[in-house]
Amino acid sequence: MGDWNLLGGILEEVHSHSTIVGKIWLTILFIFRMLVLRVAAEDVWDDEQSAFACNTRQPGCNNICYDDAFPISLIRFWVLQIIFVSSPSLVYMGHALYRLRAFEKDRQRKKSHLRAQMENPDLDLEEQQRIDRELRRLEEQKRIHKVPLKGCLLRTYVLHILTRSVLEVGFMIGQYILYGFQMHPLYKCTQPPCPNAVDCFVSRPTEKTIFMLFMHSIAAISLLLNILEIFHLGIRKIMRTLYKKSSSEGIEDETGPPFHLKKYSVAQQCMICSSLPERISPLQANNQQQVIRVNVPKSKTMWQIPQPRQLEVDPSNGKKDWSEKDQHSGQLHVHSPCPWAGSAGNQHLGQQSDHSSFGLQNTMSQSWLGTTTAPRNCPSFAVGTWEQSQDPEPSGEPLTDLHSHCRDSEGSMRESGVWIDRSRPGSRKASFLSRLLSEKRHLHSDSGSSGSRNSSCLDFPHWENSPSPLPSVTGHRTSMVRQAALPIMELSQELFHSGCFLFPFFLPGVCMYVCVDREADGGGDYLWRDKIIHSIHSVKFNS
């Protein structure tokens, strides 16, 4: 029946350029079709015509009845089926060889270009390593001797699968129409020149029926493999697309990790820069580096001090607060306009609107800084925090909350508060506080005549409920700050009518207080003058 070596050699070449399902299909084609057909089926159909006998002596009747019973021999039918079903694979193999040749030329061109780059003495080590990896990859591709299944080659592969599937279905239908699923031993022939109906007998009908069912089963399995291969290619393409998408998202996550995943062990910091603060509200920081921007107009000086708590901006006149997060630096930049801008009443953060502004018991444990309002021509000021003591031992003296009230240009009362660190030597002067207390009676009558009062400028919570002291810059911890409620309330009421704004400025290793007094001249205007207590750097306020 001819030699199958040529067809087998070509199909073996196709085997190297197929998918795993395609290789299974080729294995079934080789073993269960070509081998079975050559070794066993030929002998079964060898005496097909000679053993076909009819009960008539009419010349030509046997030939006519045999031709009617077997329009085409099943052996030749199966050979044609193998050739036609394999022909799309041969076409694909031709295209694959063409692409392989073009791929080899491109590989040689790339290899020559990379070798030319290697001869350049100005290449750095990283570039040389990259070129070496590329050369090794090209050599590996040469050993594989295979073209990547993508692009037009992939389309050709899918097309050849569809074509052989259609041919497989066609041959299965043809075999069923010609012979069905069973070979009958008796065939009645009514073709002329046979007289009437002639009985003809088929040799080895049972054996032929078995081979017929076997070939039908192999054809059905081949068709199922073709369908599975199409699904395999589609699923693989979808998975490749999803993998590329997930890889790109992974790269984006690595290049830009979220802010909440960044952890820092450095001390918290506070920076003061230029903008107009409106309202300052507290936040709680957990071992993260934070930057707070509080604006001082006409000044480019920036102080950087430890910040135990985080500040954010929340406008008191209904404006929308905003903040900027820098994910790469791990800092929070808070832009705050002037805390005195607007004429609305002062409010303390962490309290409801119906709460008293002077009740320290109503303040939240996380709140440590309040807000104040004033005329828009007021001088801007910067609010800092105290630097924690470098001494890890507790000082035993609490911080004192001082409140002072004064009048603005409209006659409304203003209140300011500050924490005085008694543990620091020289943090305040006794003479200055004595003067403030002595002037209480003089300003008390003026403050009592005011019709409208605003909430505290700087309001601090109960530090007796503070969870734990925050670490200083040197890594030490300060002691728990305990508040003496009665002395604080007394001093707050004393400074409530003192008419002085006392503002703290803290630099690393320096504790500085600035007192701003407003004095009325004969015309009713207020003059600003500043006093610096225990100061190293001078601070100016521009009215």
Swiss-Prot record:
Keyword Transmembrane appears in the UniProt entry: yes
Protein's cellular compartments: Cell membrane; Cell junction, Gap junction
Gene3D superfamilies named among the record's database cross-references: Gap junction channel protein cysteine-rich domain
MF terms (GO), sorted A to Z: gap junction channel activity
InterPro entries, per the entry: Connexin (IPR000500), Connexin_CCC (IPR019570), Connexin_CS (IPR017990), Connexin_N (IPR013092), Connexin_N_sf (IPR038359)
Biological process, per Gene Ontology: cell-cell signaling; detection of light stimulus involved in visual perception; gamete generation; synapse assembly
TM segment ranges: 17-37, 77-97, 166-186, 210-230
Topology Cytoplasmic: residue spans: 1-16, 98-165, 231-543
Chain intervals for the UniProt region annotation (Disordered): 306-359, 379-424
Protein family membership: Belongs to the connexin family. Alpha-type (group II) subfamily.
Protein name: Gap junction alpha-10 protein
Naturally occurring in which organism (per UniProt): Homo sapiens (Human)
